[in-house]
Amino acid sequence: YLTIVPLFHCNGWTHTWMVPAVAGVVICCRDVTARNVYHAISVDGATHFGGAPIVLNTIIAAKEDDRLPFDHTVQVFTAGAPPPAATLAKIEPLGFNVTQVYGLTEVYGPATECAWQDDLWGETEQAERAAIKARTGVAMPVLEEATVLDENMDPVPWDGESTGEIMMRGNGVMKGYYNLPEATASAASAGDTLRSTSASGSRRL
């Protein structure tokens, strides 16, 4: 696992202990450049990393001298913003499979993801492929539930258009903000569900 996300992020510092726990290897990258990323993949054998879309664009824009060959598909978690269709169209042929994830510190980092179904979407055109990969609503195992509720706390329709507040519940959801009871109260609903007040979403099947 190539560490690109800073270690003070949940995604960064959890991987530093989780990867060795399953007999994996952590490769540290102090200076995130295309040359260093390609070196970690080609020479050190990195198979996974996480990074914002800007990191993907750095790889795409690499000078020819900075590119090194590799013979495996690199799995990439990206977050912060959906990867643009143009970015996906350029980086996937280079040997990178991009998965969009969503999360925040209050839920211990990434909590939902786009669960790609190749049997359904494997032959889709690039524009539709990018739109599907921008979805990120499938709860990861640490999350009991992820849903989208309207202002009345009712689930929004599964139409992909109606928007509401993202709500999450599970073992990884924070108990509260330290010494900030008012902030905790505003972020919690029914005591055990986190209101993602900074983000809205929609639902579709």
What are these model-predicted stretches?
Residues 1, 26-27, 48, 98:
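A short hydrophobic/small-residue beta-strand
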Residues 3, 28, 51, 78, ...:
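A structural signal for the hydrophobic beta-strands that form the central parallel beta-sheet
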Residues 8-47, 62, 145:
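Conserved AMP-binding/adenylation subdomain of ANL enzymes
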Residues 21, 43-51, 60-131, 144-145, ...:
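Gly/Ser/Thr-rich phosphate-binding loop
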Residues 33, 55-56, 83, 173:
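Alpha-helix capping/helix-boundary segments
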